[in-house]
Structure formats: structure tokens, C-alpha cells
Amino acid sequence: MRLVKPIFLCACAVVLMTACGRMDKGAQMKTENTQINQFTESAFDADTKITDVIRDPAFGDYGRLLFPVDFEIPDNLKLKDVREILPWYSKINTDKTVELVNTMKERAQSGEQIFYDIYSDAEKKADPEKKDTGLFFFRGDAGAKTAIVNAGGGFVYVAGIHDSFPQALELSKKGYNAFALIYRPGAQTACEDLARAIAFLQEHASELQIDMADYSLWGGSAGARMAAWLGAYGTSYFGEADYPAPAAVIMQYTGLSEVTGNEPPTYACVGTSDGIASYRTMENYIARIKKNGTNAQIEVFKGLSHGFGLGEGTVAEGWIDHALTFWEENMGDQK
């Protein structure tokens, strides 16, 4: 009996020590998980580093495609400084940039797939440059019409954060399904990627719950040329199967002058102070499309320079509503 008490006490001590150890480990794991959740769930703001957005776990491997992959982004650059990696652009709205990355993060965290590859692993292995392509999905209503938005960047880089993501987000708010394409810089490769994107969406429309009938192609600067070229020449010209032409092409600030006679209905807008895309060239382009009997429209905004995006707070504010109305008016007239 004398031995029972010490043994019992020792056993209790071991149990208590083990339990405490488990509690300590549990508390440590809880603390670590809390820290991870705090990092993952915290909202971005104007002072958030761009590299922190890119590396956020919510975005996985595609976070790098949120910003131009063709430029080295300094680690100290913040969201409020994004204009420093967007040459040729103006009227960059920090509040919109913050809204965009927060919206995309929230959707990704909720389990929504917001990014889609357009090339297979085998295709990307054969051509590593195809790794830097894909579609960001700004989901609207299930079964709603589809817009594909292409940012510019002079075929040197892709300015999606200012020239396609904001437009796609606004279209999704109005119920439309909008995709922002990240493509390989270069006129030919960019058009090949857009043709592939159209093919991908046509082939996966059912599972994506989108309507590709009467789809539209949108673009700014170089992205506008892509939209116009695919609209006029078609997907087969750029290596894909022959899919229907868009119901409308929506172009911003590009000095394209070539008219083939196969252009879809086209809306354009540009500023009078654009030193890259002459508004007179765009006026002439639209006039020639109209002369061919195709519906076309242009808005010219006094004093605006190149790359004004949504044009919030400028004389161009609201142009996207006019473009949307133009698209809607031309639905049902696909070639």
C-alpha cells in the first residue's frame, strides 16, 4: 500500500505533464493558424506592398499575373504606386486598384475559381511563355452573356490591373460574365492567345455557366487592336477552330486604321489629347466601318490623354455604360 501512493502521484504527474504538453502544442498550433488566417483574411489597402498581394496564399500561383510579369516589381512598391509599373497610362485610380484586389481575394477565399488556364500543361511545357497566360473570371449572373476584355501595354506588357480588370469588374456588377485575358506580349502571340481564349470559353460555356452567343470583345490600346483583329479576321486566322464573330467590339484609344470590311459593330472612345492614338485616326476608322453598312459609334473626350481606363472623375466617366448599351443593341446580329 505504501508503494501505491507514490506510483499514483507519479502517474498523475505524468498525465498532467502530458496534458499540459498537449495543451501547449494545441495553443501553439492555434496561434500559428490564427496568424496564418490573419495574413490570409486581412484586407489590402493603398499601403499594401504589391509583392504581398502577389504572394498572398489566396491567389496561389496565379498571383504573379495580377500585375505585369514583364517588369521587375521593387519590393517596396505599394498599391498606391502602381502607376510606376504602367507606362503610357493615365488616370490610374488607387481606390479602384484596392477594390479590385480585395474583391478578387474575397472571391478566391470563398472557394470561387477566379483564374483559368487556356493552355494545357503539355502546351506550356513545349512553350514556357504560355505559362504567363490565362483568364481572370469576373462572374456575373449564371447563364448571362459574356465579355472578354483585353488590356493594352504596347505589346510589351499587359496592364490588366488598370486596363481590363476594372472594366471586367464593372461588367460583372451589371450581371454580365466578364473575363480579363493575360496574354503573351507581341501582336501575333497576343491574338493567338485571344483566339485560344475564345475557343476555351466556347468549349467550356456549359460548365462555366456562361452564354457565349452574342459575346463581345473589349480592349484598350494594344488590347483594342487585338479585339478588332479577332473581330475582323476570326479565330481560325489565328490557329483555332472557326467560331462565331463577336456581336460587338469595344475599343479604347488605339490608332488602328486598317478596315477589312468584315468588322463587327464597333464602339470606340478616345481623348483629344492622346499623343499615342490620334482621335482623328479613330474617327476616320469608325466612319469607314459605318460606310460599309456596319453599325459603329465613337465618343471623343476633350482634353483626355492616353490610357484613361474607366475615366472615373473625368469627362469620360460613364463611357462604359454607353459601350454596354451599344453591345446590347447589337446582340443577335452575329455573322
Regions found by a protein language model. Name each.
Residues A144-G153:
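Short beta-strand element of the alpha/beta-hydrolase
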Residues G275-N284:
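Conserved alpha/beta-hydrolase "acid-adjacent" motif
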Residues A268-V270, D274:
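Short beta-strand/loop motif that positions the catalytic acidic residue
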Residues E32-G63, N292-K335:
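C-terminal catalytic histidine-bearing segment of alpha/beta-hydrolase fold enzymes
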Residues E192, R196-E263:
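Primarily recognizes the serine-hydrolase "nucleophile elbow" in alpha/beta-hydrolase
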Residues G160-F179:
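Short amphipathic alpha-helix adjacent to the substrate-entry channel of hydrolases
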Residues P6, V14, A19-D132:
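N-terminal targeting or regulatory segments adjacent to alpha/beta-hydrolase or S9 domains
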Residues K125-R139, K145-T146:
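A short loop-to-beta-strand scaffold at the N-terminal edge of the catalytic core in hydrolase folds
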